[in-house]
């Protein structure tokens, strides 16, 4: 009934298995990849014809995690998986980026890749397994895909690269000092296609070494996919790229000069207008049939690409007139919004980001319900890219995949320099509003985010800057590496290479390569050129602010941390939370207690923090024997009076300890609610407190000294 094919190999510390032919047989290709006990099913389907008027490649990748894979039931009211989580969105992009450039040029049929996590062993991250499964499913499906690819995760521990570290070591690098790198690399047999990473100030050589290590380690996986395809692959889809050479010749003859003049304009909006006019002029020379040719868009893009690329490689001349290694003019400002906790406006050429920092308490931490466990995050970064930033009318609503991806890239770049939670017990939220964009807006978010946090008083270990690099590689092997690329250079180039870090090293690296042939030497040159650009940007940023402010904004919360014995937690909380509610209501401060006895008291008002601190201290502190306290009479009985003298602590003043004379009843001199001065004499055999009034001057609160006997 099943024509099942299964291939297995040992890879790293576990066994990798690829199998097909048993499940989802109506898909064009379906492979279940299992690494350890983590299993991901990738199913591929594709349309047999191109939609009329389709002028782009409609590839869609969906990665989804099923809670049952880890033996969990989803939270929430509906108890089922709903909209994609951030992890699912980021992994979908992680798979999309290396496979997209490998489809045959000109193929514009719809392709759908769905990766479903079926089992998770809580050790091996499903993202790498999903990438391998997707590559294998595409390879056997018959779609014109020039793969296969494979992926690998690389760690860096004690000076050694580690293949596919376990999930627990990687999900929170900030709190794992032994692990300094989380890098994912994807590539074909001959070339690296994609890199995504977060790091702890590693050098350019260490990062390049990690990329090489990952590419070497994935080679057996590529061989395994090829071995599977030799047995299970379907007949290749008969696709012949359209020949539009005649159309391109007409387009070039009609508009090359005008298009070249348009690309010589340095101002973005003027250039866009001129390019649009050049396109219209070209269309006016074409027949009706040629204007409706589905390859017209490709012909126009080829003309634009040849003009831009030729000028850069042959003449060293960029669109805006800069040298290849020059960064656009930078303007940095901080503290521009009066009521926010921290703010910065970072402008680099025609790219601008307004980044705002908000400080919160433990109550503001983000709760993350992941397959490998539940945890909280106290650092959030949200990136917004409204249509007005590029002068367009467009969709405005919840963040899309691109916004989530760019925000995570900036998050990775900055989290390496954050102070430890024990030293800075605040939740930090950054929001990057991209107000102008002409390339590298995610790196503007990094620069603006660093300045904004320092403006808020966050004690960063070092400022962070980011720069986007580009590459143009010609067929004859000549190439040019571009620093701080524009949007058009990104669109028409062969590599998008974003590097962020401090003066000491790299904290984040993202690379997307669109062509084969990029050698380690080219990557090394790009990294060195990026370092020079990054150091220049850090110098420009330091003109605005070079370290965190010593004072918070008056509108930001202050947090005081105190440690209490764990056996006192119950006393601070009280029955049903009665005591802690009283502390919050009386002081006006927010109070958070964890299971280790660490208490965080937060308020924008210093007096509120002081009041809450004193109330908690009075509950957990032990009174000192021999010390004088001010107390209040809370109850009078025949044998004495009970006095509340130390927070919630009461003690007995025996009738014989009230005055230096005999009393018929304590009520002769005391009444409930009266303030008295008492000395703690000690504790009786049952631990009860013994107090005395008669040894204390009730006016001054001074202890009455016994007169020395006469000689």
UniProtKB/Swiss-Prot annotation:
Cofactor field: Mg(2+)
InterPro entries referenced in this protein's UniProt entry, alphabetically: ExoRNase_PH_dom1 (IPR001247), ExoRNase_PH_dom2 (IPR015847), ExoRNase_PH_dom2_sf (IPR036345), KH_dom (IPR004087), KH_dom_type_1 (IPR004088), KH_dom_type_1_sf (IPR036612), NA-bd_OB-fold (IPR012340), PNPase (IPR012162)
The main location class comes to cytoplasm
Q: Does the keyword RNA-binding apply?
A: yes
Q: Which GO terms describe its cellular component?
A: cytosol
**Similarity-based family:** Belongs to the polyribonucleotide nucleotidyltransferase family.
State the PANTHER family in the record: POLYRIBONUCLEOTIDE NUCLEOTIDYLTRANSFERASE (PTHR11252), POLYRIBONUCLEOTIDE NUCLEOTIDYLTRANSFERASE 1, MITOCHONDRIAL (PTHR11252:SF0)
Protein name per the record? Polyribonucleotide nucleotidyltransferase
Q: Which organism does this sequence originate in?
A: Dinoroseobacter shibae (strain DSM 16493 / NCIMB 14021 / DFL 12)
């Amino acid at each position: 009934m099943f024509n099942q094919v299964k291939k297995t190999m040992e890879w790293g510390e576990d066994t990798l298995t690829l199998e097909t032919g048993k499940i989802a047989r109506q898909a064009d290709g379906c492979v279940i990849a299992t690494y350890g006990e983590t299993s991901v099913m990738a199913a591929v389907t594709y349309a047999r014809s191109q939609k009329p008027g389709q002028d782009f490649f409609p590839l869609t990748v969906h990665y989804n995690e099923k809670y049952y894979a880890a033996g969990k039931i989803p939270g929430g009211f509906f108890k089922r998986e709903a909209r994609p989580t951030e992890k699912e969105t980021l992994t979908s992009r992680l798979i999309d980026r290396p496979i997209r450039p490998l489809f045959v040029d000109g193929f514009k049929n719809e392709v759908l890749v769905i990766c479903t996590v079926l089992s998770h062993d809580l050790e091996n991250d499903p993202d790498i397994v999903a990438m391998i499964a997707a590559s294998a499913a595409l390879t056997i499906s018959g779609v014109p895909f020039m793969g296969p690819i494979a992926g690998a995760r690389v760690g860096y521990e004690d000076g050694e690269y580690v293949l596919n570290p376990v999930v627990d070591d990687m999900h929170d690098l900030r709190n794992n000092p032994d692990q300094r790198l989380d890098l994912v690399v994807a590539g074909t047999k001959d070339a690296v296609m994609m890199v995504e990473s977060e790091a702890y100030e590693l050098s350019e050589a260490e990062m390049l070494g990690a990329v090489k290590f990952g590419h070497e380690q994935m080679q057996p996986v590529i061989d395994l996919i090829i071995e599977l395809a030799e047995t299970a692959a379907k007949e290749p889809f008969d696709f012949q790229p359209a020949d539009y050479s005649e159309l391109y010749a007409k387009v070039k003859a009609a508009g090359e000069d005008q298009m070249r003049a348009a690309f010589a304009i340095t101002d973005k909006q003027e250039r866009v207008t001129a390019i649009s006019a050049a396109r219209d002029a070209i269309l006016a020379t074409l027949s009706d049939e040629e204007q409706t040719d589905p390859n017209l868009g490709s012909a126009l893009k080829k003309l634009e690409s040849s003009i831009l690329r030729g000028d850069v490689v042959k003449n060293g001349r960029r669109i805006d007139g800069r040298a290849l290694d020059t960064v656009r003019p930078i303007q940095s400002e901080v503290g521009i919004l009066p009521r926010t906790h921290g703010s910065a406006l970072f402008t680099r050429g025609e790219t601008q980001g307004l980044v705002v920092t908000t400080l919160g308490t433990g109550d503001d931490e983000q709760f993350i319900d992941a397959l490998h466990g539940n945890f909280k995050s106290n650092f959030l970064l949200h990136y917004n890219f409204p249509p007005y930033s590029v002068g367009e009318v467009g969709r405005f609503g919840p963040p899309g995949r691109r916004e989530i991806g760019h925000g995570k890239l900036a998050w990775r770049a900055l989290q390496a320099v954050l102070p430890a939670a024990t030293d800075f017990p605040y939740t930090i939220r950054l929001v990057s509003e991209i107000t102008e964009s002409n390339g590298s807006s995610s790196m503007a978010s990094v620069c603006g985010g660093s300045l904004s946090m320092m403006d808020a008083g966050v004690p960063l270990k070092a400022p962070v800057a980011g720069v986007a690099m580009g590459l143009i590689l010609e067929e004859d092997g000549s190439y040019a590496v571009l620093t701080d690329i524009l949007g058009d250079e990104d669109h028409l180039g062969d590599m998008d290479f974003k590097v962020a870090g401090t003066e000491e090293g790299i904290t984040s690296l993202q690379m997307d390569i669109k062509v084969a042939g990029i050698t380690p030497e080219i990557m090394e040159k790009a990294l060195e050129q990026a370092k020079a650009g990054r150091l220049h940007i850090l110098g420009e940023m330091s003109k605005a602010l070079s370290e965190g402010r010593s004072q918070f904004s008056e509108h930001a919360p202050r947090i005081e941390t105190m440690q209490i014995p764990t056996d006192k937690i119950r006393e601070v909380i009280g029955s049903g939370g009665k005591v802690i509610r009283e502390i919050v209501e009386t002081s006006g401060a927010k109070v958070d207690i964890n299971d280790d006895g660490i208490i965080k008291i937060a308020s924008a008002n210093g007096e509120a923090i002081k009041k809450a601190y004193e109330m908690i201290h009075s509950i957990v502190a032990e009174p000192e024997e021999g010390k004088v306290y001010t107390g209040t009479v809370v109850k009078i009985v025949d044998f004495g009076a009970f006095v509340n003298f130390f927070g919630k602590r009461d003690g007995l003043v025996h009738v014989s300890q009230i005055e230096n004379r005999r009393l018929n009843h304590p009520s002769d001199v005391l009444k409930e609610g009266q303030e008295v001065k008492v000395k703690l004499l000690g504790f009786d055999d049952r631990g009860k407190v013994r107090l005395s009034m008669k040894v204390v001057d009730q006016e001054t609160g001074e202890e009455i000294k016994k007169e020395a006997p006469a000689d």
